[in-house]
Regions:
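N-terminal pre-triad scaffold of radical SAM enzymes
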Residues: 39-43, 61, 248-274, 298, ...
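Conserved SAM/AdoMet-binding glycine-rich loop
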Residues: 39-40, 44, 113, 296-403, ...
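A short beta-strand-loop structural module common to alpha/beta enzyme folds
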Residues: 66-78
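N-terminal [4Fe-4S]-dependent radical SAM core
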Residues: 8-38, 45-46, 203, 209, ...
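Radical SAM enzyme core and accessory elements
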Residues: 1-27, 31-33, 37-39, 483-611
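Flexible glycine/acidic-rich beta-alpha junction loops that bind and position SAM and/or redox cofactors
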Residues: 77-78, 153, 207-211, 317-318, ...
Length: 611
């Protein structure tokens, strides 16, 4: 097989995607290995190697005695064509062995439009798609990642899901499999025992029944199966595993840098944001541990860039202390330090000036809505004065590029709100004219609008999505009010976001749709080069599924939702209260101004929420 791979590589784009052999990859002697895990990322090497969760769990599993975790990525179209032409099955990078030879096949799924890749990769591996068709302990397929907070569209294909943060649960799962394999358990025995691990959901243990109108009538748990599956979290991040010897990619990837996670969770509560609610409660790392991790990562990788990551990095309490240590270290070694996920209401002039020593790039902010009324509806907790004041400080400090991200189709949005985006952008331009210290290069304002997708476990999970036609009308309305040459405006095509909404709030009836779409040729749907909406519309029609049922239909507040058994810590009572506050244009202050009672702190047993 290795010889065949070597013959194919010169015929495809970016062959280094498929070779392995990178610096810091993990190799093990098969004589010392009891459990082999194929860790699959359902997208290309460039995307998967940038994924922090994959780097963490790759390290976690390879720290285990007798376990070898290897990486698998979705092939690009030219490689898939070559594989099919030569009868070459999907393989893992480290050993170049076929995925079907592995004990366990794990997926991390962070984007609904990767569902077709999951099935496509199983097909390429020669592994039966349906969980019921895979007998015995060989090729146990499980999945984690944020999409598993509504796992139902993939329920037919995945043996079990692991909800939440996986550093501890993955060790428990793989250790149980090691025991099951040694004792020659049946698959049913293993699934029964793995379902007892907190955070594990076995979909075959649950029956879904529907009303005549298509809504969900009841979810029946089989005897012994938990009725509620509560996500796992890591309480003490200072003592949690961290991958300081990260693999150095052998080809360019999307985020080719050391990635330092400063804290988990979010204090804000933007009502559209799934991560902001599903990743609660807030837990931080100490600046001392972060600084030590940073030095080890940079030393072990030779990287010339490091980023401080989180959902809102400027909300990290220890940011000043950490940057005071890191910036001199990076400056002396010509290492670039980036601090993304900044908010316009707490991005200080002092931090701006310090960052100039190690990075000078464009500023990026996400006001999300153009008017204060709509920003209050979505609980952005950000005023126009704060946006303009921050931009003015940045322009005075020498910045000449700014990116502004907005959404169209948010609940209660009107044309006045849409045009408010244009008004805000022109005020940013005026702020540049009044404050810029270097006007020779001119100003570039990049404006982007996304199509609102209602997501599970948010206050807007019940909302309807506007039609694609209405979304495009609002895009064109906004574009017609951009006259300045300083403005670049991009908007997302609606088809992908509409399909994302179908999958995000979908149920088990979408399994046949995904399977049919893959038969039609769907794969790499997150890439413009490959996404073809006709693959999906044909599949929806064939399976008799109306996409509007999941998109433009508002869900009832008393309706049973497919993801209701998945407990992310935030209560439905809180989400409903936030939804009603949205319609009253009432803001809920961030967690540092007082606990709003979301419920996520109940997940903590040993530490307190750091909000």
């Amino acid at each position: 097989m290795t010889d065949l791979i070597q013959r194919i590589l010169p015929t495809v784009q970016k062959p280094a995607r498929y070779t392995g052999g990178e610096f810091n990859e993990v190799k093990k002697d098969l004589n010392d290995v009891r459990v082999r895990v194929a860790f699959c990322f359902p997208d290309t090497y460039e995307i998967g190697m940038s994924n922090l969760g994959m780097r963490i769990l790759y390290g976690v599993m390879n720290e285990m005695d007798g376990v070898w975790c290897e990486r698998v990525f979705a092939p690009w179209g030219d490689m898939q064509q070559a594989m099919e032409q030569h009868g070459l099955p999907l393989w893992a990078l480290e050993s170049q062995h076929p995925v079907k030879d592995f004990d366990m096949v794990a997926f991390t799924i962070g984007y609904e439009m990767a569902y077709s890749n999951v099935l496509n990769m199983l097909n390429l591996a020669g592994i039966p798609l349906h969980a019921k068709d895979r007998q015995g302990l060989k090729n146990i397929v499980f999945a984690g990642g944020v999409c598993t907070f509504n796992p139902e569209p993939l329920a037919d294909f995945i043996d079990f899901f692991s909800l939440g943060e996986g550093e501890e649960s993955t060790v428990e799962i793989v250790s149980l499999y090691d025991k099951a394999k040694a004792e020659d358990w049946t698959k049913d025995q293993f699934l029964l025992e793995v379902s007892k691990i907190p955070g594990v959901y076995v979909p075959s243990f649950y029956e879904h029944r529907y009303n005549e109108d298509g809504t969900l009538a009841e979810i029946i748990a089989k005897e012994g199966a938990p009725k509620v599956i509560t996500k796992r979290i890591i309480e003490d991040l200072d003592n949690a595993y961290w991958p300081t010897k990260m693999i150095v990619p052998s080809t360019e990837i999307v985020h080719d840098r050391a990635n330092l996670e400063v804290f988990r969770g979010c204090i804000r509560g933007c009502r559209f944001c799934q991560a902001g609610f599903s990743c609660r409660p807030v837990r931080k790392k100490s600046p001392e541990v972060l600084y030590r991790n940073a030095i080890e990562m940079l030393t072990n990788s030779g990287s010339n860039e490091i980023t401080l990551s989180s959902l809102s990095t400027s909300d990290y309490r220890g940011l000043k202390e950490l940057t005071d240590e890191l910036i001199p270290y990076c400056a002396e070694r010509h290492i670039s330090l980036s601090v993304p996920s900044l908010r316009a209401d707490n991005f200080s002039r002092e931090l701006m000036e310090k960052l100039q020593a190690v990075r000078k790039s464009g500023l990026t902010f996400a006001p999300e809505a153009g008017t204060q009324r709509l920003r209050d509806v979505i609980n952005k907790n950000l005023t126009e004065d704060e946006i303009l004041s921050t931009c003015a400080q940045a322009f005075a400090g020498g910045w000449n590029n700014v990116k502004l991200y907005f959404m169209l189709g948010l609940p209660t949005e009107t044309d006045e709100d849409v045009l408010g985006i244009a008004e805000l952008v022109y005020k940013v331009i005026l702020a540049w004219k009044a404050n810029a210290t270097n006007k020779k290069r001119g100003l570039r304002v990049h404006v982007a609008t996304a199509y609102f997708v209602p997501k599970p476990h948010t206050p807007f999970q019940w909302e309807q999505q506007i039609t694609p036609e209405e979304y495009l009308r609002r895009c064109k309305l906004l574009k017609s009010h951009f006259y300045s040459k300083s403005i670049e405006y991009d908007y997302h095509a609606p088809d992908l976001s509409r399909l994302e909404a179908v999958m995000a709030r979908g149920d088990r009836r979408l399994g046949p749709v995904i399977e049919e779409a893959v038969k039609n040729g769907a794969r790499l749907d997150g890439w413009n080069e490959y996404f073809n909406i006709s693959h999906w519309f044909d599949a929806l029609n064939t399976c008799g599924i109306d996409p509007d049922f999941y998109t433009t239909r508002g869900f009832g507040e008393d309706e049973l939702l497919a993801w209701d058994p998945m407990d992310v810590g935030v209560t439905k009572k809180f989400l409903l209260r936030e939804r009603r506050r949205a319609y009253e244009s009432q803001v809920t202050p961030d967690c540092r101004h007082g606990c709003a009672g979301c419920g996520a702190n109940c997940l903590l047993k040993e530490v307190e929420c750091d909000a």
